[in-house]
Design a protein with these regions (language model features):
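Short substrate-entry loop that stabilizes the transition state in hydrolases
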Residues: 59-64, 72-112
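Alpha/beta-hydrolase fold nucleophile elbow
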Residues: 133-145
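Short beta-strand/loop motif that positions the catalytic acidic residue
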Residues: 242, 248-250, 254
Length: 304
């Protein structure tokens, strides 16, 4: 498979970014057919991926630890446009000796919000990376903003390859959630169209293949982060059971991701007796800070 290599200056150092494309099967059997015939099929699509290797990388010897770093709604991966997706969020990771990988998504615009095809495509990119480079087959997973959807869905879909996850101001609920009388807006609630582009709600209807413009719980099963691997306990509280340790960084002044929703997700994981950490940052909005980047490295260092 052809690769494109580009060099960018990051933190006053030249870094090489390796772009490549992977094919994935985007078919989902949602027809409901009861005919006694093969209904599954291969519906091939292609997505672009980008990999950044640290200076310490070697083609033989010890494997380099791989991190999957998933971009948010404002990011994408595209060599032609010099877009590096979630790799751009975490320069301190490759400075610390980690390799970092992201994909565009199941559609060229990248705004696929953790839908099944996005997760399957990310796995294909992971397989390509560990096959062609001397990288670990157990991964650390990171996501920012809408990349929180992708992160949670990836670790739940492929738990056997994940060591731990970290997320910056993650979007965690597709549909709205009420916490102690406070309504936490879901991505489904975002109906505003900008510059002629589809709204977030429109994107969900498209990429999750809803049969109409009404919310369709069935089409989101397994890929709605707050509801995956979860149940309601006797007190009426949701209990979420993630497959690996998680740490989240969230600003108290974030108006894009509701801090109340993030706290509720953390509490729901703790109700399950699972390990999760939260660093709530006073006065910080929807942005990445040096504290987040420094602590992400420290968090991931615990698992290698």
């Amino acid at each position: 498979m052809e690769e494109i290599r580009k060099t960018y200056v990051v933190n006053e150092k030249e870094r090489e970014y390796i772009y490549f494309k992977v094919r994935f099967n985007r078919f989902r059997d949602i027809s409901g057919s009861i005919a006694h015939e093969v209904s599954d099929k291969e519906e091939w699509a292609e997505t672009e991926a980008v990999l950044c290797l640290p200076e310490s990388y070697t083609a033989d010897g010890d494997e380099t630890q791989l991190v999957l770093s998933f971009h948010g709604a404002g990011g994408r991966v595209c060599a032609q446009e010099d877009k590096t997706g979630g790799v751009a969020y975490v320069p301190k990771l490759y400075e610390a000796g980690y390799a970092v990988l992201d994909i565009c998504g199941a559609e060229p615009h990248g705004l696929t919000m953790g839908c099944p095809e996005h997760i399957f495509a990310a796995y294909k990119a992971y397989r390509y990376a560990i096959k062609h480079y001397n990288l670990s087959d157990k991964v650390l997973v990171m996501g920012a903003s809408m990349g929180g959807h992708v992160t949670i869905n990836f670790i739940n879909t492929y738990p056997s390859i994940v060591l731990a996850a970290g997320m910056f101001y993650p979007r965690l609920n597709m549909d709205g959630v009420t916490v102690d009388g406070h309504y936490c807006i879901g991505t489904w609630d975002k109906t505003t169209r900008k510059d002629g582009n589809p709204s977030t709600k429109d994107r969900i209807i498209d990429i999750y293949r809803f049969p109409s413009e009404e919310w369709c719980e069935e089409r989101t099963i397994g890929f709605n982060p707050y509801r995956v691997r979860s149940f309601i306990n006797q007190e009426g509280k949701r209990v979420v059971i993630p497959p690996c340790p998680i740490k989240i960084w969230q600003g108290t002044e974030d108006v894009t991701v509701d801090p109340v929703m993030v706290q509720e997700f953390v509490d729901s994981v703790k109700r399950a007796g699972c390990y999760i950490e939260l660093h709530m940052l006073e006065g910080i909005g929807h942005k990445t800070t040096p504290v987040m980047r420094d602590e992400l490295v420290m968090w991931f260092n615990r698992f290698i």
